[in-house]
Amino acid sequence: MIENGGNDMALQFILGSARSGKTDFIYDQMIKDSMEHEDEEFFFIVPDQSTLNAQKQLVTRHPRHGTFNIDVVGFFRLTYRVFEELSYIPKDLLEDEGKSMVIRKIMEQHKEELKVFASSMKKQGFIDELKSFFAEVYQYDVSMEDLKKITDGMKEEGLRSKMEDILLVMENFEDYIKERYLISEQLLDVLAQKVERSEKLKNATFYLDGFTGFTPIQRKVLEKLLKIGKNVYVGLTLDGRYVRSQY
């Protein structure tokens, strides 16, 4: 257990390989804690695609067959919980197809400036590859300045030209959405900016499970939860060759 500063909040990692019983331990501990402290808030954070299954598991395992003071959320659902509490209305969310249209439009408008990608933009799957790259840049909290430094340091001319094309498209993409839209990859950054204002999350206990690791932007949110929460328990699935289950 790692104590945080001068308050009583504690961070505890629960490590185990797949099928080690780690998740059973987390459910049992979370249910026990929530029943012993019925006036407190508990949040069970799982990967977004796993929330429905986690809710079913919780209802099945709970002696009273309900979730009660445990809120099962993914990071994105948690984001909208906070937005709703704070009466914050975010910019419109630019969906996947909208991203494709914007990127395609930018490339068409700047095709004379593109060194490599002008001939690639009509190839099947190319726009999707660019979107995936953009998503990773946002998820891993890489700034445009970071990308420019990386590009400036490249010796191989072909690779450098590709990166310069990416920078051109990405800068124009950011300029386009800046005043109009958010993309899903930016939501957690907004959450990190606002989460400390949430009264509902203050002094709550957080359990996290189902993750093999966290992106930098997820870690930024976790750092804020550590500041305002009562306890944070993080279950991580690790390769059994490298870790002995700890709980």
Q: Which stretches of residues belong to each language-model region?
A:
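Structural recognition of the conserved hydrophobic beta-strand(s) that form the central parallel beta-sheet
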Residues: F44-V46, V72, Y207, N231-L236
